[in-house]
From Swiss-Prot:
Reaction proceeds by a ping-pong mechanism involving intermediate methylation of a conserved cysteine residue. Disulfide bonds join 112-336. This is Probable dual-specificity RNA methyltransferase RlmN. GO terms for biological process: rRNA base methylation; tRNA methylation. Its EC number is 2.1.1.192. It is an enzyme of class 2 (transferase). It comes from Porphyromonas gingivalis (strain ATCC 33277 / DSM 20709 / CIP 103683 / JCM 12257 / NCTC 11834 / 2561). InterPro entries: Aldolase_TIM, Methyltransferase_A, RlmN_N, RNA_MTrfase_RlmN, rRNA_lsu_MTrfase_RlmN/Cfr, rSAM. Belongs to the radical SAM superfamily. RlmN family. It catalyses: adenosine(2503) in 23S rRNA + 2 reduced [2Fe-2S]-[ferredoxin] + 2 S-adenosyl-L-methionine = 2-methyladenosine(2503) in 23S rRNA + 5'-deoxyadenosine + L-methionine + 2 oxidized [2Fe-2S]-[ferredoxin] + S-adenosyl-L-homocysteine; adenosine(37) in tRNA + 2 reduced [2Fe-2S]-[ferredoxin] + 2 S-adenosyl-L-methionine = 2-methyladenosine(37) in tRNA + 5'-deoxyadenosine + L-methionine + 2 oxidized [2Fe-2S]-[ferredoxin] + S-adenosyl-L-homocysteine. Specifically methylates position 2 of adenine 2503 in 23S rRNA and position 2 of adenine 37 in tRNAs. The keyword Nucleus does not apply. The active site is at residues 99, 336. The gene is rlmN.
C-alpha cells in the first residue's frame, strides 16, 4: 500500500483518451505524435514502466515518470474455485479493495469487473450492497483489473457485473469503455462487453454514448415487490427503465438481457412469469434466470431446478429466449451477489 500512496500524488495516464494523452505530450514539449505513442504503450503494449517506452527519448521518459504514473499495480490476492473460476483482489487506494472474477468456459474467458467499492443500491440479496458504498473507481482502476489479471492476454469478454452499480459511476465507466473500444486504445469490439444496471440514472447516456450490450437486473415484475428486494426501485422505477429501453432500437447487433434471480416461494410462480412476459413486451431481449447464492443474515432461498425449469418453459411459451445461468465460483464467494471486500478492508485497518 505504501507504493500506491506515493503514486497517488502523480497524475495517472491509464484511462486517458488519445486527446488527453496528446495534451500531455505537448505540455511536456514532445511532438504531437507522441500522444499516439503513449496510447500504444499504455493500451496495446500495456507498459508497466516508462522505461519500456523505447521509441520515446530517455530524457522525455524521465520527465514523464517525474509527473505521471501509469496506473498499473498488481492484484494482492487470488482464490481458485473447484470449477476453474478465479477471484482476484485489487487494492484501490488506502485500505480499499475490489474483487474481479475470471470465468473460463471452453474457448471463452470472461472477466467480471467492479466499478465501485461497495454499492449504494443495498439489494437484499447482494453482499456488495451489505458493505455499503466506499467510493467510485476511476477509469484507471477499472482498466487495471483487466490489464493485471494473469489471464489478461486470453480474455474474450468483459462484464461490468462485479462490485457496484456501473451507471452510478457513469463518467468513469464510459471513459474505461472508450479506452477499451476505440482504435487508439485496445480496439475491442463493443460486442465483447456487457454492462449491468438496475436502471440507474446513467442509462440514457450509456445507450447514447456506447455500443456495448446491456443487462438489466430485474428480479420481480411487480414494482412494490421489487422495491422490497431492491430499494433502488424507489429512485429508479423499473417501468421507467423499460420505457427508456423500449424507445431505443435494439434491432441491430447490440443486445439487451434481463437478469432474474429466482427465489423459492417469492418470485418463481407462473403469475410472475406471465407478468414478466407482459412488462417486457416490445423489447427484443433474453432473460437469464439465476440461482440465489446464500449469503449471511439473509433468509431468502433459491428455487429448485424443477421450478426454475418450469419458469423457463413458461417464458419460452410467451416467445422469449430464456436460459438458466450456470453458477460459477460459489465455493470461493465469487458467484452472483457474493462479492464483498469488507473482510479485506477490516484486516487492512487492523494492520495499519
Amino acid at each position: 500500500m505504501k507504493q500506491q500512496t506515493e503514486t497517488e500524488k502523480k497524475v495517472v495516464l491509464l484511462g486517458m483518451s488519445l486527446e488527453e494523452l496528446t495534451t500531455v505530450a505537448l505540455r511536456m514539449g514532445m511532438p504531437r505524435f507522441a500522444g499516439k505513442q503513449l496510447a500504444e504503450w499504455i493500451y496495446v503494449r500495456r507498459a508497466t514502466d516508462f522505461a519500456e517506452m523505447t521509441n520515446i527519448s530517455q530524457a522525455n521518459r524521465q520527465k514523464l515518470a517525474e509527473i505521471y504514473d501509469l496506473g498499473r499495480y498488481p492484484w494482492s490476492d487470488v482464490q481458485c474455485s473447484v470449477d476453474g473460476t478465479k477471484k482476484y483482489l485489487f487494492p484501490v487506494g488506502e485500505g480499499r479493495f475490489v474483487e474481479s472474477v475470471l470465468i473460463p468456459e471452453g474457448d471463452r474467458a470472461t472477466l467480471c469487473i467492479s466499478s465501485q467499492v461497495g454499492c449504494k443500491m443495498d439489494c437484499l440479496f447482494c453482499m456488495t450492497g451489505k458493505q455499503g458504498w466506499n467510493g467510485n473507481l476511476s477509469a484507471a482502476e477499472i482498466l487495471n483489473q483487466i490489464f493485471s489479471v494473469d489471464e489478461a492476454a486470453e480474455l474474450t469478454n468483459l462484464v461490468y457485473m462485479g462490485m457496484g452499480e456501473p451507471l452510478d459511476n457513469t463518467d468513469e465507466v464510459l471513459r474505461s469503455i472508450e479506452a477499451l473500444t476505440e482504435p487508439w486504445g485496445m480496439g475491442w469490439s463493443p460486442k465483447r462487453i456487457t454492462v449491468s444496471t438496475i436502471g440507474a440514472k446513467g442509462l440514457e447516456r450509456f445507450l447514447a454514448e456506447s455500443r456495448c450490450h446491456l443487462a438489466v437486473s430485474l428480479h420481480s415484475p411487480f414494482p412494490e415487490e421489487r422495491r422490497k428486494l431492491m430499494p433502488g426501485e424507489k429512485a429508479f422505477p423499473i417501468m421507467q427503465t423499460l420505457d427508456r429501453i423500449r424507445a431505443y432500437d435494439f434491432s441491430g447487433q447490440r443486445r439487451v438481457s434481463f437478469e432474474y434471480i429466482v427465489f423459492d416461494g417469492l418470485n418463481d410462480d407462473m403469475r410472475h412469469a406471465d407478468e414478466l412476459a407482459a412488462i417486457l413486451r416490445g423489447i427484443p431481449c433474453r432473460i437469464n434466470l439465476i440461482r440465489f447464492h446464500k449469503i449471511p443474515a439473509v433468509s431468502l432461498r433459491s428455487s429448485d431446478t424443477a421450478r426454475m425449469e418450469a419458469f423457463r418453459k413458461r417464458m419460452e411459451s410467451h416467445g422469449y429466449t430464456c436460459t438458466i445461468r450456470a453458477s460459477r465460483g460459489e465455493d470461493i464467494f465469487a458467484a452472483c451477489g457474493m462479492l464483498s471486500t469488507s473482510k479485506a478492508e477490516s484486516s487492512e485497518e487492523k494492520s495499519s
